[in-house]
From Swiss-Prot:
<dbReference type="InterPro" id="IPR044892">
    <property type="entry name" value="Ribosomal_L3_dom_3_arc_sf"/>
</dbReference>
<dbReference type="GO" id="GO:0022625">
    <property type="term" value="C:cytosolic large ribosomal subunit"/>
</dbReference>
<dbReference type="InterPro" id="IPR045077">
    <property type="entry name" value="L3_arc_euk"/>
</dbReference>
<keyword id="KW-0687">Ribonucleoprotein</keyword>
<keyword id="KW-0963">Cytoplasm</keyword>
<comment type="similarity">
    <text>Belongs to the universal ribosomal protein uL3 family.</text>
</comment>
<dbReference type="GO" id="GO:0003735">
    <property type="term" value="F:structural constituent of ribosome"/>
</dbReference>
<dbReference type="InterPro" id="IPR019926">
    <property type="entry name" value="Ribosomal_uL3_CS"/>
</dbReference>
<dbReference type="InterPro" id="IPR000597">
    <property type="entry name" value="Ribosomal_uL3"/>
</dbReference>
<dbReference type="GO" id="GO:0003723">
    <property type="term" value="F:RNA binding"/>
</dbReference>
<dbReference type="InterPro" id="IPR009000">
    <property type="entry name" value="Transl_B-barrel_sf"/>
</dbReference>
<keyword id="KW-0689">Ribosomal protein</keyword>
<protein>
    <recommendedName>
        <fullName>Large ribosomal subunit protein uL3</fullName>
    </recommendedName>
</protein>
<dbReference type="GO" id="GO:0006412">
    <property type="term" value="P:translation"/>
</dbReference>
<dbReference type="Pfam" id="PF00297">
    <property type="entry name" value="Ribosomal_L3"/>
</dbReference>
Length: 387
């Protein structure tokens, strides 16, 4: 027999244990960027829905690279980002054990979209959520003003409660996603005033992110169910003549300690994990009401970001959207949280100015020969189905 090694590096990363299903489908932001009071008040994250992927062409601006000033083709992800609605504000107090919630103030009127989030069965419920709370505004809102004054006096961190407008997306879901987003910039009083002014009002994505910015994406990955140890951990397949299976771990531990260690690779859940993907460059923040939001300086074709036939398993995008470089966690239709980067990225890729030359809007189902219906009609002529 040839030389055989009796040791090897372990298979699989132990830094993401336990590999189990996420508690919620929405990506939860556990850390926000550091606050800078010299800047104006602004949100630090946003909610959107993953629509699908496409392809772009641009000139690389990277001196020293062999592809400098040459065209490159890159994969991008399109995130549908209808405006979010501000419905509340939360004040946090710093304690020796971390942040503690001081109080929460809700807006006077909440839509049924967000009220559904508080019910397990909306149709069988009495739909009385927040009826008593909204009565606080009847008496000139004195009690609400006192709670806001408490936040201004004692709180050190201010976060707003926002929800998505899921009815503006192609999704059949009626229940909005509710999230807590930190406000950065200005004093605590300025943050509370900003939150109160935006109660029951919408905030667009272009007021949070801009082109060429590096952001993070927090989402739940695509689920794959119960998976074997070879695919789940990448362990080596055993020799052909191995007794009772090849895609297994031959030794799962010593006699003593008389239990299986937590670090041993085992079969189980793969996917549907909560993950944060960092440093995605924003290639474009598009407007939904622009009929040429997929046009560029080099491609003057009047077309929208929605490809022919719509995004597969999603549909058409009629709202504002964000184009991000590369792929992001999650499946189509999944809610994703876009967060400002926690640190200032000074790499060449982060500082590079991106100018898109062409955005692919061909059908994502099949070969995709045509970019617009007009181009298809000009090539094929009048079809029998159009008569």
């Amino acid at each position: 027999m040839s030389h055989r090694k009796y040791e090897a590096p372990r298979h699989g990363h132990l830094g993401f244990l336990p590999r189990k299903r996420a508690a919620s489908v929405r990506g939860r932001v556990k850390s926000f960027p550091k606050d800078d009071q010299t800047k104006p008040v602004a949100l630090t994250s946003f909610l959107g829905y993953k629509a699908g992927m496409s392809t772009i062409v641009r000139d690389l601006d990277r001196p020293g690279s062999k592809f400098h000033k040459r065209e490159v083709v890159e994969a991008v992800t399109v995130v549908d980002t209808p405006p979010i609605v501000v419905v509340g504000v939360v004040g946090y107090v710093e304690t020796p054990r971390g942040l503690r919630s001081l109080t929460t103030v809700w807006a006077e009127h909440l839509s049924d979209e967000v009220k559904r989030r508080f019910y397990k069965n909306w149709y069988k419920s009495k739909k009385k959520a927040f009826t008593k709370y909204s009565a606080k505004y009847a008496e000139n809102g004195a009690q609400v003003d006192r709670e806001l004054a408490r936040i201004k006096k004692y709180a050190s961190v201010v976060r707003v409660l926002v929800h998505t407008q899921v009815r503006k997306t192609p999704l059949s879901q009626k229940k909005a996603h509710l999230a807590e987003i930190q406000l950065n910039g200005g004093s605590v009083s300025d943050k509370v005033d900003w939150a109160k002014e935006h109660f029951e009002k919408t905030v667009a994505v272009d007021s949070v992110f801009e082109q060429n910015e590096m952001i993070d994406v927090v989402a739940v990955t695509k689920g794959h169910g119960f998976e074997g140890v070879t695919h789940r951990w990448g362990t080596k397949k055993l020799p052909r003549k191995t007794h009772r299976g090849l895609r297994k771990v031959a030794c799962i531990g010593a006699w003593h300690p008389a239990h299986v260690m937590w670090s041993v690779a085992r079969a189980g859940q793969r996917g549907y994990h909560h993950r944060t993907s960092i440093n995605h460059k924003v290639y474009r923040v598009g407007k939904g009401d622009d009929e040429a939001n997929a046009a560029t300086e080099f491609d003057r074709t009047k077309k929208t970001i929605t490809p022919m036939g719509g995004f597969v398993h999603y549909g058409a995008i009629n709202n504002d959207f964000v184009i991000l470089k590369g792929s992001i966690p999650g499946t189509r239709k999944r809610v994703v949280t876009l967060r400002k980067s926690l640190y200032t990225n000074t790499s060449r890729k982060a500082l590079e100015e991106v100018t898109l030359k062409w955005i692919d809007t061909a059908s994502k189902f099949g070969k995709g020969r045509f970019q617009t219906p007009a181009e298809k009609h000009a090539f094929l002529g009048t079809l029998k189905k159009d008569l």
